[in-house]
Amino acid sequence: GRRAERLDSLRQELGDRLHTSVLDVCDREAVQQCVASLPPDFAEISVLINNAGLSLGGGKFQEDELDDMLTMIDTNIKGVVHVTHAVLPGMIERDRGHIFNIGSVGGVYTVPGNSIYGSTKSFVHMFTLDLRAELLGHHIRVSVLEPGAVDTEFIEVRARGDKTARDRHYKGMRIISADEFADILFYAYSLPPHVNANIIEVMPTDQNWNRVAIHRET
């Protein structure tokens, strides 16, 4: 996780059942060190959830800040690669495990303003499928969950900390709660160990992908 205060709160709630680390997934060496130094009771990772990700900018490609684009690439792509590369060898050695990569419908459908964010999530989609193919013969499951509108801090982060942005963006919509999305992930994990949910795409009923843009000359 990124925020020590939230991790401390969880540790107080769950006690010795939880081990926490403040970690920047963009830092390859820090990720490797974190995984290598886990306490014995937590060293054998059976489930990996690559959930770190963000969207910045949201304007036209040529007008957005290049630093924002590189931050998305570092977090959404390199972060997934760093953590998976550190954790997967142990899963292969034990011949069991489940990797969940959190993608987005933005990586499947075109959305203006999403050229970089959507591309990073397209990477997550194909990385999941290719990794799944490479692991054929191992008892390791690999799944990508691709949500639409979920009630997280996604919009607030994109809006540079504007806490009112979420309400404006989702005004009049009933969106998926974080708990509901967690239930979907747990469902995929709870399937029999020989059953792999490759791709799970989910949206609230108030959202779909039917956005066709037409330009007309005047």
Region spans (language model):
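Active-site helix of classical SDR
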Residues: 84, 120
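Residue(s) in the substrate-gating loop at a strand-loop-helix junction
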Residues: 104
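C-terminal helical subdomain
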Residues: 144-148, 163-211
